[in-house]
Amino acid sequence: MSQEYGRQQVEIGGKVVELLVPLERYLSAGVHIGTHICTAYMRKFVYRVRPDGLYILDIRKTDERLRVAAKFLARFEPSKIVAVSVRQYGQRPVQKFCTYIGCKAITGRILPGTFTNPSLEWYVEPDVIVVTDPRADSQAVDEAARMGIPVVALTDTDNRVENIDLVIPVNNKGRKSLALVYWILTREILREQGKIPQDQDLPEPPEAFEFKVRRH
């Protein structure tokens, strides 16, 4: 698996860069596929715009932000990290991420007061949160901002970034994209923490993080 998902030096736009996984892995998972809308802040992460108006994210910047996010999150006590996904496709990736890292997953609806009301039985007091989509997970983002909790967010071209402290530019709507991104983030955090060697992958492939669509 290390050869299949290991770091790779590639030339993009005339520059040689080292990516956390081979470029074709990012591309086949659709991590670079944005939307037909791009907010002002997200323009800095755009590689090009297709003739049909679809914004394409710059994989180099995605890769760079994944490294930054992993180093940042590795500094926190795992039990004080909360990862959130209201949307269905992000729920299994979040659960797998939390299983490996040892943090708390909140999937499905975010109950009001989760981060702000200590009298509630579901109250949680994290030191940092990771959200899968700032729009869908806006309740978590808003409450974290009110409490001064840093927010790391997987952010697509159409997302606004108010109250987001660290943006990771990705396709945050695709099953395969979310699986690969959370897999990479998990691996890099564990490497930063010294829990796995720098040249070692997770025991499961990214597909294990992917939401499974039920066939009827």
From Swiss-Prot:
Keywords: Ribonucleoprotein, Ribosomal protein. SUPFAM superfamilies: Ribosomal protein S2. One of its GO terms (molecular function) is structural constituent of ribosome. PROSITE patterns: RIBOSOMAL_S2_2. One of its GO terms (cellular component) is small ribosomal subunit. Disulfide bonds: none annotated. GO terms for biological process: translation. InterPro entries: Ribosomal_uS2, Ribosomal_uS2_arc, Ribosomal_uS2_CS, Ribosomal_uS2_euk/arc, Ribosomal_uS2_flav_dom_sf. The keyword Ribosomal protein applies. HAMAP family: Ribosomal_uS2_A. Belongs to the universal ribosomal protein uS2 family. PANTHER family: 40S RIBOSOMAL PROTEIN SA. This is Small ribosomal subunit protein uS2. The lineage of its organism: Archaea, Thermoproteota, Thermoprotei, Desulfurococcales, Pyrodictiaceae.
